[in-house]
């Protein structure tokens, strides 16, 4: 019976953290002015009226560079906590992290060989 009371704080935070965004979305929908005019359908570019067609097609190279960046950014997210607790975790976790980095290096070499990192 005592163990059920230990989760009261968890459930309170879960309910409150769920209600706050729902309430914010509800209030913004109720209080926001509804106006449909030509300004709503024009694109906004730093306060300057757009000239010509606002729809541009980006080259696939931008996406490839972004994808490679995201992969190595996620690598940093995983390796930083590991490096901070390296002395506590031991050798087995070092081997796992080494295999993780090795897989990422193989992926980088593969992307390099396929020409994904070539700009022109």
Swiss-Prot record:
<feature type="transmembrane region" description="Helical">
    <location>
        <begin position="9"/>
        <end position="29"/>
    </location>
</feature>
<feature type="transmembrane region" description="Helical">
    <location>
        <begin position="62"/>
        <end position="82"/>
    </location>
</feature>
<keyword id="KW-0520">NAD</keyword>
<dbReference type="InterPro" id="IPR000440">
    <property type="entry name" value="NADH_UbQ/plastoQ_OxRdtase_su3"/>
</dbReference>
<dbReference type="GO" id="GO:0008137">
    <property type="term" value="F:NADH dehydrogenase (ubiquinone) activity"/>
</dbReference>
<keyword id="KW-0618">Plastoquinone</keyword>
<dbReference type="Pfam" id="PF00507">
    <property type="entry name" value="Oxidored_q4"/>
</dbReference>
<dbReference type="GO" id="GO:0048038">
    <property type="term" value="F:quinone binding"/>
</dbReference>
<keyword id="KW-1133">Transmembrane helix</keyword>
<keyword id="KW-1278">Translocase</keyword>
<dbReference type="GO" id="GO:0009535">
    <property type="term" value="C:chloroplast thylakoid membrane"/>
</dbReference>
<keyword id="KW-0793">Thylakoid</keyword>
<protein>
    <recommendedName>
        <fullName>NAD(P)H-quinone oxidoreductase subunit 3, chloroplastic</fullName>
        <ecNumber>7.1.1.-</ecNumber>
    </recommendedName>
</protein>
<keyword id="KW-0812">Transmembrane</keyword>
<keyword id="KW-0521">NADP</keyword>
<comment type="subunit">
    <text>NDH is composed of at least 16 different subunits, 5 of which are encoded in the nucleus.</text>
</comment>
<comment type="similarity">
    <text>Belongs to the complex I subunit 3 family.</text>
</comment>
<feature type="transmembrane region" description="Helical">
    <location>
        <begin position="88"/>
        <end position="108"/>
    </location>
</feature>
<keyword id="KW-0934">Plastid</keyword>
<keyword id="KW-0874">Quinone</keyword>
<keyword id="KW-0150">Chloroplast</keyword>
<dbReference type="GO" id="GO:0030964">
    <property type="term" value="C:NADH dehydrogenase complex"/>
</dbReference>
<dbReference type="GO" id="GO:0019684">
    <property type="term" value="P:photosynthesis, light reaction"/>
</dbReference>
<keyword id="KW-0813">Transport</keyword>
<dbReference type="InterPro" id="IPR023043">
    <property type="entry name" value="NAD(P)H_OxRDtase_bac/plastid"/>
</dbReference>
<comment type="function">
    <text>NDH shuttles electrons from NAD(P)H:plastoquinone, via FMN and iron-sulfur (Fe-S) centers, to quinones in the photosynthetic chain and possibly in a chloroplast respiratory chain. The immediate electron acceptor for the enzyme in this species is believed to be plastoquinone. Couples the redox reaction to proton translocation, and thus conserves the redox energy in a proton gradient.</text>
</comment>
<dbReference type="InterPro" id="IPR038430">
    <property type="entry name" value="NDAH_ubi_oxred_su3_sf"/>
</dbReference>
<keyword id="KW-0472">Membrane</keyword>
């Amino acid at each position: 019976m005592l163990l059920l009371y230990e989760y009261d704080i968890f459930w309170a935070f879960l309910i409150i953290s769920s209600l706050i965004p729902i309430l914010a979305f509800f209030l913004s929908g109720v209080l926001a002015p509804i106006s449909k005019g030509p300004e709503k359908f024009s694109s906004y570019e730093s306060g300057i009226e757009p000239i010509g067609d606002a729809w541009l097609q980006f080259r696939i190279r931008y996406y490839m560079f972004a994808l490679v960046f995201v992969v190595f950014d996620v690598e940093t997210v995983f390796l930083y906590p590991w490096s901070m607790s390296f002395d506590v975790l031991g050798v087995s976790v070092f081997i796992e992290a080494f295999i993780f980095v090795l897989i990422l290096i193989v992926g980088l070499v593969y992307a390099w060989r396929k020409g994904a990192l070539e700009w022109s």
